[in-house]
Amino acid sequence: MDGGGAHRTPEDVFRDFRARRAGMIKALTTDVEKFYQQCDPEKENLCLYGLPNETWEVNLPAEEVPPELPEPALGINFARDGMDEKDWLSLVAVHSDTWLLAVAFYFGARFGFDKESRKRLFSMINNLPTIYEVVTGTAKKQSKEKTPKTSGKSNKSGTKPSRQPEPNSRGPKMPPPKDEDDSGGEEEEEEEDHENTLCGACGDNYGQDEFWICCDACETWFHGKCVKITPAKAEHIKHYKCPNCSSSSKRARA
């Protein structure tokens, strides 16, 4: 986002925030193997940047002083080999959340947001789970605590695979839509339950018309598009592991 002469709204800044956030979540989840390799402790001070096009990059800090935008935490690569991987990723996630807020409110100040505009911006930001919550699985736990799972319902799905496997089956899973034969109150509860399901890659909520798949290792739900799994591919997967669990297993065997 550039300064420009056009009037900017909290919604404009929030779109920038959300795009940068999506990129950083990808780095710490679906692209974690690539991110881990790029954070070589032998290199100079490296930073994780979230970009406005929903991608990420690991790079050196800006050379200009002061920088055009607030800078993310320096030297995230130095702690990589001295910490447990999950703890290191959690630390990077915390610093990433801090940086995103700094950038958002930098734009807010630059565009002259008043009290109400700042409040609206923060409210939109606060409605999303933090990167830390997504990376550590806290967002998923909070969602479960907020809306208890309903039981005794048929689990039909509008996308393939045609049904959600039973707990002991090995196939990939998807959040089931509401049962049309249930009462209206139960339908609303089920719908709210689904809406509170968060993608482990992008952190967005479940949508009824979207294909989702569940990792059999960490039991985290993902948009199929976020982990590059289509309904056709899912039909042939007996035991699905998300990119994060797959890469962790590879490093454990190395």
Curated annotation (Swiss-Prot):
Question: Which is an annotated GO molecular function term of this record?
Answer: zinc ion binding
Quick one: where's region Disordered? Answer: 137-194
UniProt KW keywords: Chromatin regulator, Metal-binding, Nucleus, Transcription, Transcription regulation, Zinc, Zinc-finger
Query: Matching SUPFAM superfamilies, A to Z?
Result: FYVE/PHD zinc finger (SSF57903)
User: Record's superkingdom?
Assistant: Eukaryota
Q: Which PROSITE patterns match?
A: ZF_PHD_1, ZF_PHD_2
GO BP terms, alphabetized: chromatin organization; regulation of DNA-templated transcription
List the biased-composition ranges (Acidic residues): 179-194
User: Could you say which residues form the signal peptide?
Assistant: none
Where is it localised?
A: Nucleus
Gene Ontology CC terms, in alphabetical order: nucleus
**Entry's transmembrane regions:** none
Q: CDD domains, alphabetically? A: PHD_AL_plant (cd15613)
- Site positions (Histone H3K4me3 binding): 206, 212, 216, 221
What spans are recorded as compositionally biased (Low complexity)? 149-162
InterPro entries listed in its UniProt record: Alfin, Alfin_N, PHD_AL_plant, Zinc_finger_PHD-type_CS, Znf_FYVE_PHD, Znf_PHD, Znf_PHD-finger, Znf_RING/FYVE/PHD
Q: Where are the zinc fingers (PHD-type)?
A: 196-248
Q: Name one Pfam family in it.
A: PHD
Q: According to its UniProt entry, what is the function of this protein?
A: Histone-binding component that specifically recognizes H3 tails trimethylated on 'Lys-4' (H3K4me3), which mark transcription start sites of virtually all active genes.
Subunit comment for this entry?
Interacts with H3K4me3 and to a lesser extent with H3K4me2.
User: What the record says about its domains?
Assistant: The PHD-type zinc finger mediates the binding to H3K4me3.
Q: Which family does it belong to?
A: Belongs to the Alfin family.
Q: What is this protein called?
A: PHD finger protein ALFIN-LIKE 8
